[in-house]
């Protein structure tokens, strides 16, 4: 009986909290289908803002402001907040929340899909992202110019752990190495699902991303083309990964284009398979596996291919 009473009490508290959040949001029902999970715990909101180390002169990009729980606190710290929100109902709530206050003049709201929007200039980014746009948003952010100082981002826990994974880790993947090529990434804290309204089905984590400025002198499309091939089967040796007929056809096409531009004659008995194996052997990566290779390894491998006229984009 005590357990039943406890469960009933917990459900009652959840309903009461939901009613309070609905009241704060003007009676809005949140659309979880587009990732609307409002961060309700003020301690976590404050911690995220502290981690951003904002300056009074900063312009802050906030993605997914929701009902403005974090927006208001950002406005108190920064010179300006540019909030990107997809839902017009929440845009109205944001404006209503600061209407008639000194903070109103510091808020700019961009209405629409952040992935399809041109990002403004900003010094720092703070975002409680819809989790389904995590990967494309990270790379939109990292390829944005001019450089920003840092981003404090909320992600699904597993995605966050992939971002910070190192060679040899189970979760180490293409996302890990591509992100770490362009930025320093740190896991800051775990956030339980009950800190959101409505609660998501997964646990969350907060990550800090600082872009490398200047960026590494590497063509990212070339880099990603190589990494994509090797991580399709990250446990295979590179020798095996490059035996794929689709991969060889792509690289031979690129090689022939390169030779045509350079006015280089290709021997009649040319074999792309032999060429690839020769490069893998000479660079010492033939028996290596992507799961255990770090950024320096991939840079050496990419330079080895490019030096022989083989390109990945």
Curated annotation (Swiss-Prot):
PANTHER family: DIMETHYLADENOSINE TRANSFERASE, DIMETHYLADENOSINE TRANSFERASE-RELATED. The keyword S-adenosyl-L-methionine applies. GO terms for molecular function: 18S rRNA (adenine(1779)-N(6)/adenine(1780)-N(6))-dimethyltransferase activity; RNA binding. Signal peptide: none annotated. Its EC number is 2.1.1.183. The keyword rRNA processing applies. Belongs to the class I-like SAM-binding methyltransferase superfamily. rRNA adenine N(6)-methyltransferase family. InterPro entries: KsgA/Erm (IPR001737), rRNA_Ade_Mease_Trfase_CS (IPR020596), rRNA_Ade_methylase_Trfase_N (IPR020598), rRNA_adenine_dimethylase (IPR011530), SAM-dependent_MTases_sf (IPR029063). One of its GO terms (cellular component) is nucleoplasm. Specifically dimethylates two adjacent adenosines in the loop of a conserved hairpin near the 3'-end of 18S rRNA in the 40S particle. Involved in the pre-rRNA processing steps leading to small-subunit rRNA production independently of its RNA-modifying catalytic activity. Part of the small subunit (SSU) processome, first precursor of the small eukaryotic ribosomal subunit. It catalyses: adenosine(1779)/adenosine(1780) in 18S rRNA + 4 S-adenosyl-L-methionine = N(6)-dimethyladenosine(1779)/N(6)-dimethyladenosine(1780) in 18S rRNA + 4 S-adenosyl-L-homocysteine + 4 H(+). This is Dimethyladenosine transferase. Pfam families: RrnaAD. One of its GO terms (biological process) is positive regulation of rRNA processing. S-adenosyl-L-methionine binds at residues 37, 39, 64, 85, 113, 128. It is found in: Nucleus, Nucleoplasm; Nucleus, Nucleolus. Keywords: Methyltransferase, Nucleus, RNA-binding, rRNA processing, S-adenosyl-L-methionine, Transferase. Gene3D superfamilies: 1.10.8.480, Vaccinia Virus protein VP39 (3.40.50.150). It comes from Mus musculus. Part of the small subunit (SSU) processome, composed of more than 70 proteins and the RNA chaperone small nucleolar RNA (snoRNA) U3.
